[in-house]
């Protein structure tokens, strides 16, 4: 049996929530002067391109063996599309103007809080690592890691990579958190809305839980873990 590289599926799926919201707005709000039409049309078109690449990765896989694992030649193409799409994403987002961004949840009013949360996450992550090293009697190793230039190169690479792959992360956050979460919280309350959102978000992962993250026989276990993750992080 020929194995397929299914990595294209989650890459495309991450854009679906935001693309769905944008398509709805393009249809129902087309008379609104504050609608970021160009930005929305581009994102929907980008999603369509990734869907085509995903279908092609199955219909014309052109797989190669990479360390005994299937590697589709469509994988780098998908990466190029995401990187190029992210660059255009930033350009169109900035060109849309503050009023359009503010009207459709594309402009944060609390950057200072976001930066503080990022710094808090980094601080807690490092603290966890320091405690683990201290408990194992390897605290000196932490100092060596932090003094290694490679550590900082990787850190800044991850930072740059976020901006060059932002469309994937934006797809879920805009669709679920900006649009669906407030809608559910309005109908079912703050806690009920978050719990229901987590359930919907978890079920949304079902295809890749069964056919990408794990094998079908382990799909239910993966789906159960998604419920825990999506509800607790919601």
Question: Which residues does each PLM region occupy?
Answer:
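Functionally important transmembrane alpha-helices
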Residues: 1, 191-202, 215-234
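Specific transmembrane helices
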Residues: 1-169
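Membrane-embedded glycan transfer/ligation machinery
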Residues: 13, 17, 173, 177-178, ...
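Membrane-interface helix/loop boundary segments of multi-pass membrane proteins
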Residues: 123, 170-198, 212
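Membrane-interface interhelical connector segments
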Residues: 138-149, 175, 180-182, 209-221
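Short, motif-level signal for alpha-helix interfacial/capping segments enriched in acidic residues
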Residues: 146-155, 182-186, 224-228, 232-233
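Hydrophobic transmembrane alpha-helices of Major Facilitator Superfamily
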Residues: 158-162, 166, 170-175, 203-206, ...
């Amino acid at each position: 049996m020929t194995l397929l590289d299914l990595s294209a599926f989650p890459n495309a799926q991450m854009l679906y929530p935001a693309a769905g919201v944008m398509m709805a707005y393009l249809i129902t709000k087309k008379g609104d002067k504050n609608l970021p039409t160009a930005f929305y049309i581009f994102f929907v078109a980008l999603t369509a391109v990734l869907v085509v690449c995903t279908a092609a990765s199955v219909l014309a896989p052109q797989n190669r063996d990479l360390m005994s694992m299937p590697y589709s030649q469509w994988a780098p193409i998908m990466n190029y599309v995401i990187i190029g799409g992210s660059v255009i994403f930033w350009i169109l987002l900035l060109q849309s103007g503050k009023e359009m961004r503010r009207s459709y949840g594309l402009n944060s009013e609390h950057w200072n809080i976001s930066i503080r949360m990022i710094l808090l996450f980094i601080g807690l992550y490092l603290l966890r690592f320091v405690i683990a090293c201290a408990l194992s009697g390897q605290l000196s190793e932490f100092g060596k890691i932090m003094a290694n230039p490679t550590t900082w190169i990787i850190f800044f690479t991850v930072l740059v990579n976020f901006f060059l792959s932002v469309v994937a992360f934006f797809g879920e956050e805009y669709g679920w958190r900006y649009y669906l979460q407030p809608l559910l919280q309005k109908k079912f309350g703050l806690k009920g809305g978050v719990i229901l959102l987590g359930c919907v978000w978890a079920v949304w992962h079902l295809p890749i839980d069964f056919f990408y993250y794990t094998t079908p026989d382990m799909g239910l276990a993966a789906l159960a873990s998604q419920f825990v993750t999506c509800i607790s992080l919601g």
